Regions:
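A short aromatic-anchored loop/beta-hairpin motif
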Residues: 31-214
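N-terminal secretory signal peptides that target proteins for export/translocation
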Residues: 1-13
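Bacterial N-terminal signal peptides
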Residues: 15-28
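Intrinsic disorder/low-structure terminal segments
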Residues: 7-9, 23, 59, 194
Length: 214
């Protein structure tokens, strides 16, 4: 795993969040991803994708990915076990250009994948809802708005959350090919894993829960 990103590098990324968070609105999450893809189990939306122990791509060694999109047009997921740094809640409010009453403490930032490294994604528990909120599978949601970051900084946000920059993406048929090569296992999504405070054990725990050896 790469070394933690220093705050001096995190802050410029957070400053760009307002401009790039709109990327989420381009994701076709509103349409049902239920098409038979010709891969075992069909769509993996709402599932965990777990790197096989033999994974030789350094970007995905021991990666656990929450799949938020998977249909005939391709696939998109967020790596949930790559923490890269922390930012104080006060600095978070500054980064998104707002004022408020931040609580003490820091927010961990994750590397969500190697694509669009400046794109911000907020995964969170489902009791929190805004007009922009999209349900992934009824257990985890995603909100495309800096307002969720403000609410998190002021302890008014979701009970559980994960803020990541970047994502893992596959073109049409690409993920299916990797599945047939046995590069990945799958497991049912579990908020206890997605929001686990002990990131170092997520891959091992996910492997213990794997439901399908592809």
């Amino acid at each position: 795993m790469k070394s933690r990103m220093p705050a001096s590098r995190l802050m410029p990324i957070l400053h760009r969040l307002l401009g790039v968070v709109a990327l989420l609105a381009l994701l076709p999450l509103a349409r049902a991803a239920t098409t038979d893809l010709g891969a075992p189990g069909g769509s993996l939306r709402g599932q965990l994708l777990i790197a096989a122990p033999e994974m030789d791509d350094p970007r995905f060694v021991h990666a656990v990915i929450l799949m938020v999109q998977h249909d005939q047009g391709g696939a998109l997921g967020i790596i949930i076990n790559r923490p890269v740094g922390e930012v104080t809640y006060a600095d978070l409010l500054k980064a998104i250009g707002t004022t408020g009453s931040p609580v003490p403490g820091k927010l961990r930032i994750f590397a969500g994948g190697p694509v669009e490294l400046n794109a911000g994604f907020v995964l969170h528990s489902t009791e929190y809802h805004r007009p922009e909120t999209q349900q992934i599978d009824g257990k985890v949601a995603m909100t495309a708005s800096p307002d969720v970051l403000r609410d998190i900084a002021e302890a008014k946000g979701p009970k559980k959350s994960l803020v990541a920059f970047g994502y893992a993406g596959w073109g049409p048929g690409q993920l299916e090919s990797e599945l047939m090569r046995h590069d990945w296992f799958t497991a049912d999504e579990d908020p206890a894993l997605v929001f686990d405070d002990d990131r170092g054990l997520v891959w091992k725990d996910a492997m213990n829960r794997r439901s399908q050896a592809l």
